[in-house]
Amino acid sequence: MTNSNLRTENHFDYVKISIASPQRIMDWGQRTLPNGQVVGEVTKPETINYRTLKPEMDGLFCEKIFGPSKDWECHCGKYKRVRHRGIVCERCGVEVTESRVRRHRMGYIKLAAPVSHVWYLKGIPSYVAILLDIPLRDVEQIVYFNCYVVLDPGDHKELKYKQLLTEDEWLEIEDEIYAEDSIIENEPIVGIGAEALKQLLEDLDLNQVAEELREEITNSKGQKRAKLIKRIRVIDNFIATNAKPEWMVLDAIPVIPPDLRPMVQLDGGRFATSDLNDLYRRVINRNNRLARLQEILAPEIIVRNEKRMLQEAVDALIDNGRRGRTVVGANNRALKSLSDIIEGKQGRFRQNLLGKRVDYSGRSVIVVGPKLKMHQCGLPKEMAIELFQPFVIHRLIRQNIVNNIKAAKKLIQKADDEVMQVLQEVIDGHPILLNRAPTLHRLGIQAFEPKLVGGRAIQLHPLVCPAFNADFDGDQMAVHVPLALEAQTEARMLMLASNNILSPATGEPIVTPSQDMVLGSYYLTALQPNYQKPEFGDNKTTFASLEDVIFAFEDKRLSLHEWVWVRFNGEVEDEDEMRSPQKTQELEDGSKLEIWNLRRDRFDSDNNLISRFVLTTVGRVVMNYTIIDSVSKT
């Protein structure tokens, strides 16, 4: 595109995380400036100049590599202002552009010797050990310069491919090879460190190994078979992603953008810096020292020790503390490596990407709302007025209550009855989403119809608690408002709490009464021994219907556990009842009265039931009436 102000919009199907090749790592950091100069390699451990407070060239904050630290201004100050956009200063080599490029431009460190990636070496499982079919302990011995490994046995009869040799064993074999009477023509080749590991990984033909393993699996059983399956699974993943095993050994290390590992000047003139800068500095110092030792052809033992120290420095940068001693800074505090920044609850993914703050959302403590219906939740007025503010403003203007947005906001701040009336109209039929972290399954976020309540706590129906794994001991929940009509429809149709009764994992009901509800049901239907059973026909305790009993209870003429006679023509089951009536009376009108222990049944001459009075408690009447009422409505 000719105009750099125009932005292109990229659409992605998916994001894939895979191993980066050494060339890709170089491509991330390498750039060709408009004048043809190639920049990107960080070669100096310095950060900023203590006198000028400007970044050092080729250092960890280099303006030539990462971009200018001030908008439209080069390092030396020759070019200032936006009119010089895109020019590369011929004096300092800095491109004149915006300083925000320092948030995404990367660099790289070219390593003087290959180093193993600690994630693939010391992770669980160790992919390097699985691919090479060598125990992890032996792989570590090779990488950290404790043992040699045979890369090519040559003509030596006692040596085998991938065999480990100690220093003394290799010296003995060397004496044997270079003896005057030696008959060995093809000398064996051994290696040590990450270079040897890289050679072993390069020698792997994944397709051939996969074929051999598949043949071997058919004839093996038990633990051996499980081990082969684990190995073939790793190999298949490498083949599927077009990744090469030798990429697990690094030849170059990416340097993340400087604004993501800043250096800030404090009031006293001192500097606070990100731990990553210290870790990068250790790597660069050791890398430069190793390059210098190789240049002057230093003794092998010194070079090898420096390579091991470089390996440990890179390990600490990627994942401090995974292997060996943890690198500490001031006050014996462990330095925060790249892995520490990414992983865990406070890491980049969970804290900043998945757990980021969004508009039209709120958060509050939950309390029980026993009078709510299952698909309802109590939303505090204070929260609702804030969440639904754009809708309320729109309706206030549309109803000509106010003329503009500013006046609407002033009116909303007063929160008078007129605003509350409009808010009530807005939230009617507008579902909201409630989410409780951690959202471990799809029922961790459900839709509810909001009901305005006082206070500052969200009210939740007790039946939906098992799905959220919530209780009322201080749990908090987040509220989200679906804005688009499609989102509202989806929330109502698919996510409403009353539509999510079965667990997606087991298919069994997840909406089950528990704790307070079970206790309440028991208390409601329990029999109290200190209440006397009344005589049948007593005016105070005989009622014509279940509704009459409930009216009397609400009128406080009856207590919850008091015995009453109530007319009920439905089926009655009672374990304490006898098989036959205690007594049968013939009445004057030809009807018959059966006297049972807990009921009175009256039949006509054709044995049809005329009326039935049941002796029960007020609590049991309430329970039965509630169930009958709910069933009849469905």
UniProtKB/Swiss-Prot annotation:
Free-text cofactor note: Binds 1 Mg(2+) ion per subunit.
The positions annotated for binding Mg(2+) are: 471, 473, 475
Gene Ontology biological process terms in this record: DNA-templated transcription
Which InterPro entries does this entry report, sorted A to Z?
DNA-dir_RpoC1_gamma (IPR012755), DNA-dir_RpoC_beta_prime (IPR045867), RNA_pol_asu (IPR000722), RNA_pol_N (IPR006592), RNA_pol_Rpb1_1 (IPR007080), RNA_pol_Rpb1_3 (IPR007066), RNA_pol_Rpb1_3_sf (IPR042102), RNA_pol_Rpb1_clamp_domain (IPR044893)
According to the record, the segments passing through the membrane are: none
Briefly, what is this protein's role? Answer: DNA-dependent RNA polymerase catalyzes the transcription of DNA into RNA using the four ribonucleoside triphosphates as substrates.
Q: Know the name of this protein?
A: DNA-directed RNA polymerase subunit gamma
User: What organism does the UniProt record list as the source?
Assistant: Prochlorococcus marinus (strain MIT 9215)
